Swiss-Prot record:
The gene is PET112. It is an enzyme of class 6 (ligase). InterPro entries: Asn/Gln-tRNA_amidoTrfase_suB/E, Asn/Gln-tRNA_Trfase_suB/E_cat, Asn/Gln_amidotransferase, Asn/Gln_tRNA_amidoTrase-B-like, GatB, GatB_Yqey_C_2, Gln-tRNA_amidoTrfase_suB_CS, Gln_synth/guanido_kin_cat_dom. GO terms for molecular function: ATP binding; glutaminyl-tRNA synthase (glutamine-hydrolyzing) activity. GO terms for biological process: glutaminyl-tRNAGln biosynthesis via transamidation; mitochondrial translation. One of its GO terms (cellular component) is mitochondrion. Subunit of the heterotrimeric GatFAB amidotransferase (AdT) complex, composed of A, B and F subunits. Keywords: ATP-binding, Ligase, Mitochondrion, Nucleotide-binding, Protein biosynthesis. It holds the Pfam family GatB_N. The lineage of its organism: Eukaryota, Fungi, Dikarya, Ascomycota, Saccharomycotina. Allows the formation of correctly charged Gln-tRNA(Gln) through the transamidation of misacylated Glu-tRNA(Gln) in the mitochondria. The reaction takes place in the presence of glutamine and ATP through an activated gamma-phospho-Glu-tRNA(Gln). The keyword Protein biosynthesis applies. PROSITE patterns: GATB. PANTHER family: GLUTAMYL-TRNA GLN AMIDOTRANSFERASE SUBUNIT B MITOCHONDRIAL AND PROKARYOTIC PET112-RELATED (PTHR11659), GLUTAMYL-TRNA(GLN) AMIDOTRANSFERASE SUBUNIT B, MITOCHONDRIAL (PTHR11659:SF0). This is Glutamyl-tRNA(Gln) amidotransferase subunit B, mitochondrial.
C-alpha cells in the first residue's frame, strides 16, 4: 500500500484516545485590506508581476525609515473590537530579528512587548453548528508580512511584493479541545473579517494563514506552520495528534519544535525558538501609539452589525429563515441588502426571493446581480401576479427573459412583448380552455389512469402541459378546476 493510501486510511479512521487529551491554540495571520503597505506608500499587491510594487523601505535599503499607515491601524482596531478585545491605550512596535531571504530588513516589525489589544474572546454557538464554547484570545498585534520565496528547479527566487503588507496576528489561548472546534473557529473568523471588510477572508490565497500549536496531555507544544486551507488544518492536526500519541505510547518524548505540513505528514523544520532567540528590541524609528480612552466605544459605534447578530435576526420573526439560507445571505452582502429591500414589500418574500428569483438566476447559469432584476422590478412582478394580471408561469417567463437578455424594458412592455398578459374572460376563452384540457387528457391516457387510481399529484403533469401550451397566460387554478371537472 502506498504512503498516501495509508495516510488517507488513517485519517479516515481518526478518533481521539480518551487517555490522551488534545489541546490546541492558534496564531492567525490576517492581511488587512489597505490601499498601501504598513510602513511605506507602496500599494499592496497580490497578483502583480514579481518585485514591481516596492519602495526603498520594502527592500531594506539603508537609510530608509518606516511611516505607519493609519488605515492599517484603523482596521486592526476594528478587528480587535469585533473580537471583544481590550484596546490598549499604549502600544508600540518591536523588531523581531531573524535572517531569511524573504525578510530583507533582517528583522520583522511586530508588537511583542505592548500589543494593540488583549484579552478578547470568540463565542462558538448554534450558528456554528457547535455547542456553546468560549475561545479566549491573548492578544491582537499589528505587524508586517514577509516576501515570498518561489522554488524553480535548482533556484530559489524571491518576490518582495508582499513584504511590508499589513497584518494582524490574532493569538488564541490553548482552549480548543477538539479539531471540530478549531474548524468552526477558523470559519467564524473568516466570516467576521470578510463581513467587516477587514480582509478578504481567503485561506487559499494566503490572505489568512494559520499556525497551530498542539499538545497532548500537557506535554511540550508543537507548532505547525502556515496551514493554508481548512482541509490542511484538519488533516495536519489529526496527523500530529496521532504522531504524538503514538510517540507517548512507545515511551517517547515530545520536544518543543516547529513542524511543517507537506500534504501527507508533519515534518520537523527547526527546534522551537523562544523570545531570546529573536532578540526582540523596541523599534527606535517608530513612535509609540497612544489612543484616547474612549476609542473602544467610538469604534464600537462604527462597526457594521456582526455576523452572529445578523444570523440571529434573520432566523427569527419576521424573517424566519432557515439557518442555511441566512448563512448564504451573510456570505454575500449584496444579496442580503437586496433581500432586506424587498422583505415587507411583497407577501411571501422568502418564496419569491429564494425559490423564484435566485432559482431563475441559477437555471439561467447567470451570477446574481442586483442591477439585472432590480428590487422594484421584482416587487412589480409579484404585484402583477397578485392582481391576476399575469400568472406565476408568466412571472417566471419574465424573470428568465430579463436575466438571459439583461432587458431594461418596463414590466408592461415585457408583458406585451412576451404576450403573457391574462386574456379577458369570455365564452371564447372558456371554450379554448376546455378544448386544451380535453386534448391533453386524450393524449395522456397513462396519467389519467394514475389519477383515476387515486394518485392526485399526477394532475400536476396535466396542468403543467396546459400552462406550457398557453405560455402561462391562464392561471393554473383555472386549469386545475377544468381538469377536475372533465375527469369526474
Amino acid at each position: 500500500m502506498s504512503q498516501i493510501s495509508m495516510f488517507v486510511r488513517k485519517l479516515h479512521k481518526f478518533s481521539y484516545n480518551p487517555n490522551y487529551k488534545f489541546k490546541c491554540g492558534l496564531e492567525i495571520h490576517t492581511q488587512l485590506k489597505t490601499k498601501y503597505k504598513l510602513f511605506s506608500l507602496s500599494p499592496t499587491s497580490y497578483n502583480e508581476p514579481p518585485n514591481t510594487k516596492l519602495s526603498y523601505f520594502d527592500v531594506g535599503l539603508p537609510g530608509t525609515q518606516p511611516l505607519l499607515n493609519p488605515e492599517a491601524l484603523l482596521l486592526a482596531l476594528k478587528a480587535s473590537v469585533a473580537l471583544n478585545c481590550d484596546i490598549q491605550s499604549y502600544s508600540s512596535f518591536d523588531r523581531k530579528h531573524y535572517f531569511y531571504a524573504d525578510q530583507p530588513l533582517g528583522y520583522q516589525i511586530t508588537q511583542h512587548y505592548y500589543p494593540l489589544a488583549k484579552n478578547g474572546y470568540v463565542q462558538l454557538n448554534k450558528f456554528d453548528d457547535m455547542p456553546d464554547k468560549v475561545i479566549s484570545l491573548e492578544q491582537v498585534q499589528l505587524e508586517q508580512d514577509t516576501g515570498k520565496t518561489v522554488n524553480y528547479d535548482d533556484r530559489i527566487n524571491v518576490d518582495l511584493n508582499r513584504a511590508n503588507t499589513p497584518l494582524i496576528e490574532v493569538v488564541t489561548k490553548p482552549d480548543f479541545e477538539n479539531i471540530d472546534q478549531v474548524q468552526a473557529f477558523v470559519r467564524k473568523y473568516q466570516l467576521l473579517v470578510s463581513h467587516l471588510d477587514i480582509c478578504t477572508g481567503d485561506l487559499e490565497t494566503g490572505a489568512i494563514r494559520v499556525d497551530a500549536n498542539i499538545s497532548v496531555n500537557n506535554n511540550p507544544r508543537v507548532e505547525i506552520k502556515n496551514l493554508g486551507s481548512s482541509g490542511e488544518i484538519v488533516d495536519a492536526l489529526k496527523y500530529e495528534y496521532n504522531r504524538q500519541v503514538t510517540l507517548l505510547q512507545n515511551n517517547g518524548k515530545i520536544i518543543q519544535e516547529t513542524r511543517g505540513w507537506n500534504g501527507i505528514a508533519t515534518e520537523s523544520l527547526r527546534k522551537k525558538e523562544n523570545a531570546v532567540d529573536y532578540r526582540y528590541v523596541p523599534d527606535s524609528e517608530l513612535p509609540v501609539i497612544r489612543l484616547d480612552k474612549n476609542i473602544q466605544a467610538q469604534l464600537q459605534n462604527t462597526l457594521d452589525e456582526l455576523p452572529d447578530s445578523v444570523l440571529d435576526r434573520l432566523t427569527k420573526e419576521p424573517y424566519n429563515l432557515q439557518l442555511a439560507h441566512a448563512r448564504n445571505l451573510l456570505f454575500q452582502p449584496e444579496i442580503l441588502d437586496y433581500y432586506e429591500n424587498i422583505f415587507g414589500r411583497i407577501r411571501d418574500a422568502n418564496k419569491w426571493f429564494f425559490h423564484e428569483l435566485l432559482a431563475a438566476f441559477a437555471k439561467s447559469d447567470v451570477e446574481f446581480q442586483v442591477d439585472i432584476v432590480s428590487p422594484d422590478m421584482l416587487v412589480d412582478i409579484v404585484s402583477s401576479v397578485e392582481k391576476n394580471e399575469i400568472s406565476l408561469t408568466g412571472a417566471r417567463i419574465i424573470l428568465k427573459h430579463i436575466i438571459r437578455n439583461k432587458s431594461t424594458k418596463t414590466l408592461p412592455q415585457l408583458i406585451k412583448e412576451l404576450d403573457i398578459g391574462k386574456p379577458e374572460a369570455s365564452a371564447e376563452l372558456e371554450e379554448a380552455i376546455n378544448e386544451i384540457c380535453q386534448q391533453i387528457i386524450n393524449t395522456n391516457a397513462d396519467v389519467v389512469e394514475k389519477i383515476a387510481r387515486g394518485h392526485t399529484n399526477a394532475l400536476q403533469v396535466l396542468i403543467g402541459q396546459a400552462m406550457k401550451a398557453t405560455k402561462g397566460k391562464v392561471h393554473a387554478k383555472e386549469f386545475r378546476s377544468k381538469f377536475m371537472e372533465l375527469l369526474k
